[in-house]
Amino acid sequence: MSDVAAILKVMPESPEIDLEALKETIKNTIDADSFERIEEEPIGFGLIALNVTIVVDDGEGGTEPAEEALAALDEIQSVEVTDVRRLM
């Protein structure tokens, strides 16, 4: 099996959420071997999505454990996989 890089779009619960604290929570929630980076994406009305890049095995489950772990956080409204690319 090979690895894939996936981008998860994480939508905070509200614009009032402390993004720096949320970024730290996300880093601590995702397996350190999988985590790559977090980028901010302005959505509108003060809401900023976080695009979280992870690298996972393309086997069974893939991004699902990370998606479920992030979705379980109170500060997060939704988690969506927006891109998946096989690494060479």
Swiss-Prot record:
MF terms in GO: translation elongation factor activity
One protein family per Pfam: EF1_GNE
Keyword line: Elongation factor, Protein biosynthesis
Domain of life: Archaea
Disulfide bonds: none
Family stated for the protein in its record: Belongs to the EF-1-beta/EF-1-delta family.
UniProt function note: Promotes the exchange of GDP for GTP in EF-1-alpha/GDP, thus allowing the regeneration of EF-1-alpha/GTP that could then be used to form the ternary complex EF-1-alpha/GTP/AAtRNA.
Protein name: Elongation factor 1-beta
Organism of provenance: Methanosphaera stadtmanae (strain ATCC 43021 / DSM 3091 / JCM 11832 / MCB-3)
